[in-house]
């Protein structure tokens, strides 16, 4: 059966043994090289990598100064990883509804959820399908809110020809977990629009330490280097950074194959009783999966599994989970989740 997800690993990892035996395994040369390569690929100036998406999320929330009692507006139609960190930090998630055709935030619903405690809008681009970028950003700007793009599944997706991360959001968060492209076995990254937030995030990622001042002229810990912000142990190690760097060299061809598969699926499904997930204007999904809307979801999934393709609904709406509290009906979420099916569209096969 053709799997829905599959970890990619380059054939050429010739320097891996040297790194393993180098004695320099913590974040260093390869970590900085990966960050520079990602900056160039995405088209941004301020980016840090982390050892997981979850770590990136916690670093981001701390850097932005979001705290217990604050509210963030988000979509429940997302990976649990995309909303769980808010609960960890005591930040109240307020669910907005989604457009049942696209699976992404409905700008009017977002607008209606804003209160005096709202600090940010968290814009998930569901399964790589890009949401209403300008409309959601406008709501954030009009109300003095941070706009955070969630690219957990959307690396390489585009809006108006620009890759996600280069659209002007205050921050964009990425996952480099095993089934993402690229993957670093596990890892993540954050892009910042603002240099000051970026500088702060470098400290927050590394226990609040300014590494340029941490050691004195005898290489002892310097008493002159104060720790002024709380932080985490979230740097990405050299092995993972090297693997990510090698994958990034192949990323365009991998994404191109996913797009070719999407074209193949569109033709293959012409006579099926399904509709494609609607692609919002001026956007290009990365086709991490190929998304359709089926009236008989269970039957459609079973049918394609019997044909050798692992179809799946992928995510359960996070509003089902009691940790986020019961906030009432979300009709767009209900309709979309009852119909959405993901079909394999990955780099490892051809339709």
Where are these regions (language model features)?
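Conserved PLP cofactor-binding pocket of PLP-dependent enzymes
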Residues: 207-220, 264, 297-341, 345
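Short beta-strand segments
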Residues: 51, 122-124, 175, 243, ...
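Active-site phosphate-binding strand-loop segment of PLP-dependent enzymes
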Residues: 101-184, 189-197
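Generic structural signal for small/hydrophobic residues in well-ordered secondary structure
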Residues: 16, 38, 56, 72, ...
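Proline-centric
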Residues: 93, 249, 342-350
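Active-site region of PLP-dependent enzymes
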Residues: 154-160, 167-288, 321
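Conserved PLP-anchoring active-site segment centered on the Schiff-base-forming lysine
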Residues: 58-114, 120-122, 304
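Conserved PLP-binding active-site segment in aminotransferase class I/II-type PLP enzymes
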Residues: 1-63, 67, 88, 123, ...
């Amino acid at each position: 059966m053709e799997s829905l997800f599959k970890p990619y690993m380059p054939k050429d990892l010739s320097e891996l043994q040297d790194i393993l035996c180098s004695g320099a395994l913590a974040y260093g040369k390869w970590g900085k090289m990966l960050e520079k390569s990602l900056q160039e690929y995405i088209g941004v100036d301020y980016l840090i990598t982390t050892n997981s998406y979850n770590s990136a999320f916690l670093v981001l929330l701390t850097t932005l100064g979001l705290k217990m009692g604050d509210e963030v507006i988000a979509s429940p139609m997302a990976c649990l990883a995309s909303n769980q960190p808010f609960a960890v930090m005591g930040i109240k998630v307020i669910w907005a509804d989604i457009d049942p055709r696209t699976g992404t935030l409905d700008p009017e619903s977002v607008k209606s959820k804003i209160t005096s405690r709202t600090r940010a809008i968290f814009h998930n681009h569901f399964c790589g399908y890009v949401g209403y970028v300008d409309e959601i950003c406008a709501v954030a700007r009009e109300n003095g809110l941070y706009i955070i793009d969630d690219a957990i599944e959307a690396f390489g997706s585009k809006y108006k020809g620009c890759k996600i991360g280069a659209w002007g959001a205050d921050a964009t968060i990425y996952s480099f977990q095993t089934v993402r492209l690229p993957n670093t076995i596990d890892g993540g990254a954050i892009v910042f629009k603002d240099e000051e937030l970026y500088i702060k995030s470098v400290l927050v990622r590394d226990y609040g330490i300014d590494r340029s001042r941490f050691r004195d002229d005898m290489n002892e810990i310097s008493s002159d280097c104060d720790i002024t912000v709380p932080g985490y142990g979230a740097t990405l190690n050299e092995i993972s950074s090297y693997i990510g760097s090698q994958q990034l060299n192949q990323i365009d061809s991998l994404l191109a194959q996913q797009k070719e598969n999407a074209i193949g699926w569109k033709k293959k499904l012409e006579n099926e009783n399904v509709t494609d997930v609607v692609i919002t204007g001026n956007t290009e999904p990365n086709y991490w999966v190929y998304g359709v809307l089926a009236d008989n979801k269970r039957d459609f999934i079973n049918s394609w599994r019997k044909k050798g393709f692992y179809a799946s609904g992928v995510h359960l709406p996070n509003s089902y989970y009691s940790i986020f509290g019961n906030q009432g009906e979300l009709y767009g979420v209900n309709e979309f989740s009852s119909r959405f099916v993901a079909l394999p569209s990955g780099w490892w096969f051809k339709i």
